[in-house]
Swiss-Prot record:
Keywords: Electron transport, Heme, Iron, Membrane, Metal-binding, Mitochondrion, Mitochondrion inner membrane, Respiratory chain, Transmembrane, Transmembrane helix, Transport, Ubiquinone. Component of the ubiquinol-cytochrome c reductase complex (complex III or cytochrome b-c1 complex) that is part of the mitochondrial respiratory chain. The b-c1 complex mediates electron transfer from ubiquinol to cytochrome c. Contributes to the generation of a proton gradient across the mitochondrial membrane that is then used for ATP synthesis. The cytochrome bc1 complex contains 11 subunits: 3 respiratory subunits (MT-CYB, CYC1 and UQCRFS1), 2 core proteins (UQCRC1 and UQCRC2) and 6 low-molecular weight proteins (UQCRH/QCR6, UQCRB/QCR7, UQCRQ/QCR8, UQCR10/QCR9, UQCR11/QCR10 and a cleavage product of UQCRFS1). This cytochrome bc1 complex then forms a dimer. PROSITE patterns: CYTB_CTER (PS51003), CYTB_NTER (PS51002). This is Cytochrome b.
Length: 380
């Protein structure tokens, strides 16, 4: 008799995704981040659900309801901090996952890659709206500044911003709709993640060498389930260390002050995971130019597959490209640092140089390095 997991319509899907999935035998720990992102998403949905049971999306009570969750709800403080720091862990895993895709040439799976970019956009939108909900100073001013950027769009800009706000400023209507969107988007992310997996399983996983591994596949379970469990344990350990010992390390002290439209904080800045894009936005003096650069800093990922000029898929055997990849990582870390600094000398010029380098490396230097490597290997 055939095993039920191979015949039952529902079990068959689970079996083909997590148990009997043919997987390359040589994938490294960099391939752990997909499952870690799944764990992060489930964790965020669960903690978010419990927070939503006690939160009120009204400008007069939102801040107090978050305080109430932390002080009066049983284990409310741990749920709140797991949700806030869980978002940081989510983005750490996201950046590692994207970095892995860039390094090993996983972007040649076009559908999987493009849905991944869409997932990144959706996650960023969700995180931004979530940051507005506690209705602290940085929540209010962050929402005002970022939504106001849309007013740079010619002709329809101002109307669009007022339509998003639901009035002439960020107010009750804005908070209510942000809560509604913040609640629904994670489920859309979950659906997109399933489509992401569907397309991945059409082609099978890439591997560090970038060479097709159809001749050497092993079942996902038990080899990679045990590896994923180790990764998940380390992720939860890191998250709980953050939650229990340094819950406010990655937050902003200004968000412990209730929102006040009459008092602007000295330095308006988003959460750390948006700082690189914020630095690119600020590096251009023109408003529309800044908005375009901000959008392009993420949209550029869609162009990466078309900029691949190497005869090899992975960077494993391409030292010049490897070097440029790590320069890009250093550049992104520089942008993240600059995004958190005030707009004054020397930060402005450093931010502008780092922004130019970011686009230059992706659009010009890396494709050129690949062509040089092809020629060095006599691959015309």
């Amino acid at each position: 008799m055939t095993n039920i997991r191979k015949t039952h319509p529902l079990m068959k899907i689970v079996n083909n995704t997590f148990i009997d999935l043919p997987t390359p035998s040589n994938i490294s720990s960099w391939w752990n981040f997909g499952s870690l992102l799944g764990i992060c998403l489930i964790l965020q949905i669960l903690t978010g659900l419990f927070l939503a049971m006690h939160y009120t999306s009204d400008t007069t009570t939102a801040f107090s309801s978050v305080t109430h969750i932390c002080r009066d709800v049983n284990y409310g403080w741990i749920i709140r901090y797991m949700h806030a720091n869980g978002a940081s862990m989510f983005f750490i895993c996201l950046f590692m996952h994207i970095g892995r895709g860039l390094y090993y040439g996983s972007y040649t799976f076009l559908e999987t890659w493009n849905i991944g970019v869409l997932l990144l956009f959706t996650t960023m939108a969700t995180a931004f709206m979530g940051y507005v909900l506690p209705w602290g100073q940085m929540s209010f001013w962050g929402a005002t500044v970022i939504t106001n950027l849309l007013s740079a769009i010619p002709y329809i800009g101002t109307s669009l911003v007022e339509w998003i706000w639901g009035g002439f400023s960020v107010d009750k209507a804005t908070l209510t709709r942000f809560f509604a969107f913040h609640f629904i988007l994670p489920f859309i992310i979950m659906a997109l993640a399933m489509v992401h997996l569907l397309f991945l399983h059409e082609t099978g996983s890439n591997n560090p060498t970038g060479i097709p591994s159809n001749t050497d596949k092993i079942p996902f379970h038990p080899y990679y389930t045990i590896k994923d469990i180790l990764g998940a344990t380390l992720l939860i350990l890191a998250l709980m260390l953050l939650v229990l010992f340094m819950p406010d390390l990655l937050g902003d002290p200004d968000n412990y002050t209730p929102a006040n439209p009459l008092n602007t904080p000295p330095h308006i800045k988003p959460e750390w995971y948006f700082l690189f894009a914020y630095a690119i936005l600020r590096s251009i003096p023109n408003k529309l130019g800044g908005v375009l650069a901000l959008a392009l800093s993420i949209l550029i990922l869609v162009l990466v597959p078309f900029l691949h000029t190497s005869k090899q898929r992975s960077m494993m055997f391409r030292p010049i490209s490897q070097c440029m990849f790590w320069v890009l990582v250093a550049d992104l870390l520089t942008l993240t640092w600059i995004g958190g600094q005030p707009v004054e000398h020397p930060y402005v010029i450093i931010g502008q140089l780092a922004s130019i380098m970011y686009f230059l490396i992706i659009l010009v230097i890396m494709p050129t390095a690949s062509i040089i490597e092809n020629n060095l290997l006599k691959w015309k």
